[in-house]
Amino acid sequence: MFTLKKSLLLLFFLGTINLSLCEEERDADEERRDDLEERDVEVEKRFFPVIGRILNGILGK
């Protein structure tokens, strides 16, 4: 009976650690996705003014 309890306790402990690691990995993946969206916004902010200046130069002349 004691060995069964130890085995179950060990399985529970390992399962808890595994679940914790999966949650951390999922959170890290979500952060990476957020970073990509922020980079896209930064690229758009840099890209649109340049196009505006080019069109202004072409249409202004």
Swiss-Prot record:
Where does this protein reside within or beyond the cell?
Secreted
- Described purpose of this protein according to its UniProt entry: Amphipathic alpha-helical antimicrobial peptide with activity against Gram-positive bacteria (M.luteus), Gram-negative bacteria (E.coli), and fungi (S.cerevisiae). Stimulates insulin release from pancreatic beta-cells in a dose-dependent manner, without increasing intracellular calcium. Does not protects BRIN-BD11 beta-cells against cytokine-induced apoptosis. In vivo, intraperitoneal injection together with a glucose load into mice improves glucose tolerance with a concomitant increase in insulin secretion.
Q: Does the keyword Transport apply?
A: no
**UniProt name for this protein:** Temporin-1Tg
Maturation-removed propeptide residues: 23-44
Q: What Pfam family is a match for this entry? A: FSAP_sig_propep
Q: Which residues carry this modification: Leucine amide?
A: L59
